[in-house]
Swiss-Prot record:
Keywords: Cytoplasm, Stress response. Belongs to the small heat shock protein (HSP20) family. Residues 49-228 form the sHSP domain. One of its GO terms (cellular component) is cytoplasm. It is found in: Cytoplasm. GO terms for biological process: cellular response to heat. Signal peptide: none annotated. Gene3D superfamilies: 2.60.40.790. The N-terminal putative helical domain may be the site through which HSP30 binding to mitochondrial membrane is regulated. This is 30 kDa heat shock protein. It comes from Neurospora crassa (strain ATCC 24698 / 74-OR23-1A / CBS 708.71 / DSM 1257 / FGSC 987). Pfam families: HSP20. Disulfide bonds: none annotated. Residues 34-53, 117-136, 144-174 are annotated as: Disordered.
Length: 228
């Protein structure tokens, strides 16, 4: 990813040293990103989700007294952006964009009520057994098999109605069907061709645009000291 836009090279076209420096840094940055992206995942890294990265777009503008950087950072909070100087003429802008979302899938249709063993439950699966019993007058009457059968039926009904210990997590009420916005970590590095005043740098984030103003350092002036 270019450290400066291609148009920025043109402002220093008369000085080949600056142009070569920018192109060298640009090529090195591109090579580093390609190596990191093509590195094979081994060991425990295979089971971890790689960190998503993206590169926000910046405009770099030079005035007579300052350098101005304007970057697109929509939907990011200012507390998640860090700006620092790694050396007197290099500024690094990094941060992170986080959004919680769940990939959506069409809801599955339930074919029927399942029992604890996962088999279809049918009302006809349980029948009360009866047998003929003869009373003292030799009359045949229909009675239930035993009182134990009733107790067993009640226990089965209680187990069927009781919630299972292993319950699947409930699906979220809201889902994202499409996620196209950039999320993850980002980092941009800019190297200025001249000395800058780090103590006077200002930054603001309004309407998704990060604006950084870097004043140029005052030129060193020769001071003559008179001898008394």
């Amino acid at each position: 990813m270019a450290l400066f836009p291609r148009g920025f090279y043109g402002s220093y076209g008369s000085d080949p040293s600056f142009t070569n420096l920018f192109r060298l840094l640009d090529d090195f940055d591109t090579y580093t990103r390609e190596v990191q992206g093509s590195a094979p995942e081994t060991g425990s890294r295979r089971h971890t989700q790689p960190t998503r990265t993206f590169s926000p777009k910046f405009d770099v503008r030079e005035t007579e007294q300052t350098y101005e950087l304007h970057g697109e950072l929509p939907g990011i909070d200012r507390d998640n952006v860090q700006i620092e100087f790694t050396d007197p003429q290099t500024i690094v802008i990094r941060g992170r964009v986080e959004r919680n979302y769940t990939a959506g899938t069409p809801p599955a249709q339930v074919a029927g009520v399942l029992t604890e063993k996962g088999e279809p439950h049918s009302p006809a699966a349980h029948h009360a057994t009866v047998e003929d019993d003869v009373d003292e007058d030799n009359r045949s009457v229909a009675t239930t098999a035993t009182g134990a059968n009733n107790q067993n039926n009640q226990q089965v009904a209680q187990r069927a109605s009781a919630p299972t210990t292993e319950e699947k997590p409930k699906a979220p009420a809201e889902k994202y069907w499409v996620s196209e916005r950039s999320i993850g970590e980002f980092s941009r590095t800019f190297n200025f061709p001249g000395r800058v005043d780090q103590n006077a740098v200002s930054a603001s984030l309004n309407n998704g645009i990060l604006t950084i103003t870097v004043p140029k350092a005052k030129k060193h002036e020769t001071i003559r000291i008179a001898i008394n």
